[in-house]
């Protein structure tokens, strides 16, 4: 069986032999980040921007479905018809959308 001193020396030497691999790996990932990841993010941003430009800004036609926007009792805040996080540009009331939409 090997002595503890020889085991420690063997560990130090084996660790030193692998020291050169770490720098190459970091360099590889750095290159991959600049060559693949950044252009990929740029393509995704361009795609999202083009989709946003094509998006229709007209509101959908309001249809008063009987199973939606049921009010059995008033909300305890405001006029009782608007939910706590009501957004007049996105959320319809039982009567329809509020005012002009953009």
Swiss-Prot record:
One of its GO terms (biological process) is mitochondrial electron transport, cytochrome c to oxygen. Residues 15-25 are mitochondrial matrix. Residues 1-13 form a transit peptide. One of its GO terms (molecular function) is oxidoreductase activity. PROSITE patterns: COX6A (PS01329). GO terms for cellular component: mitochondrial inner membrane. It is found in: Mitochondrion inner membrane. Residues 51-102 are mitochondrial intermembrane. Pathway: Energy metabolism; oxidative phosphorylation. It is a single-pass membrane protein. Component of the cytochrome c oxidase, the last enzyme in the mitochondrial electron transport chain which drives oxidative phosphorylation. The respiratory chain contains 3 multisubunit complexes succinate dehydrogenase (complex II, CII), ubiquinol-cytochrome c oxidoreductase (cytochrome b-c1 complex, complex III, CIII) and cytochrome c oxidase (complex IV, CIV), that cooperate to transfer electrons derived from NADH and succinate to molecular oxygen, creating an electrochemical gradient over the inner membrane that drives transmembrane transport and the ATP synthase. This is Cytochrome c oxidase subunit 6A, mitochondrial. It comes from Oncorhynchus mykiss (Rainbow trout).
């Amino acid at each position: 069986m090997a002595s503890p001193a020889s085991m420690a020396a063997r560990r130090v030497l084996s660790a030193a032999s692998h020291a050169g691999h770490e720098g190459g790996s970091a360099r590889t990932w750095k290159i991959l980040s600049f060559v693949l990841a950044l252009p990929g993010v740029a393509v995704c941003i361009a795609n999202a921007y083009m989709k946003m430009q094509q998006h229709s800004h007209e509101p959908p036609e309001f249809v008063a479905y009987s199973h939606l926007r049921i009010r059995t009792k008033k909300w305890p805040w405001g006029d009782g018809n608007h939910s706590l996080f009501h957004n007049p540009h996105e959320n319809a009331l039982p009567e329809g959308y509020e005012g002009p939409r953009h």
